[in-house]
């Protein structure tokens, strides 16, 4: 159950229509998870400073069980997500940061319990 959060200082008017659906599909492919399990949040218009600059930038936060826990996994994921984001948002790679957060099943609540018991 991946959670993907895109935070950017780009205004909402510069976010391509349907980005949430394409980011969901890309995440499912990249992380090899079912698309109906991916949760996407996009936060445009944020106040962000990166590398001492307020030029357009983005932070991508990816949390998931079992697929973002090693450097080898995340190197591959990072390459794919960077390709997606640079194309979709027209940002250079040095204006994007990705943070990976491995989760345990007991850290996600669903259907009145936690994933451990589902």
Swiss-Prot record:
Entry-linked Pfam families: MIF
Tissue-specific expression: In all organs tested, highest levels in liver.
Annotated GO MF terms: cytokine receptor binding; D-dopachrome decarboxylase activity; dopachrome isomerase activity; phenylpyruvate tautomerase activity; protease binding
Coiled coil: none
Residues modified as N-acetylproline: 2
Any one of the GO BP annotations: positive regulation of ERK1 and ERK2 cascade
One GO CC annotation: extracellular space
Residue numbers carrying Phosphoserine: 90
Enzyme type, top EC level: lyase
Compartments, record wording: Cytoplasm
EC number: 4.1.1.84
pH and activity: Optimum pH is 6-9.
Catalytic activity as recorded in UniProt: D-dopachrome + H(+) = 5,6-dihydroxyindole + CO2
Keyword list, A-Z: Acetylation, Cytoplasm, Lyase, Melanin biosynthesis, Phosphoprotein
Segments crossing the lipid bilayer: none
Modified residues (N6-acetyllysine): 33
UniProt main location, coarse: cytoplasm
Family, per entry: Belongs to the MIF family.
Function: Tautomerization of D-dopachrome with decarboxylation to give 5,6-dihydroxyindole (DHI).
Quaternary state and interactors: Homotrimer.
Protein name as catalogued: D-dopachrome decarboxylase
Protein's gene: Ddt
């Amino acid at each position: 159950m991946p959670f993907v959060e895109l935070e950017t200082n780009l205004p909402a008017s510069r976010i391509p229509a349907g980005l949430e659906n394409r980011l969901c599909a890309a995440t499912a492919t990249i992380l090899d998870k079912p698309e109906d399990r991916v949760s996407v949040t996009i936060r445009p218009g944020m106040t962000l400073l990166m590398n001492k600059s307020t030029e357009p930038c983005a932070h991508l936060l990816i949390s998931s069980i079992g697929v973002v826990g090693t450097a080898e996994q995340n190197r591959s994921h990072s390459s794919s997500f960077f390709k997606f984001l640079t194309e979709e948002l027209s940002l250079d790679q040095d204006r994007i940061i990705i943070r990976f957060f491995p989760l345990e099943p007991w850290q996600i609540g669903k259907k009145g319990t936690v994933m451990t018991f589902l």
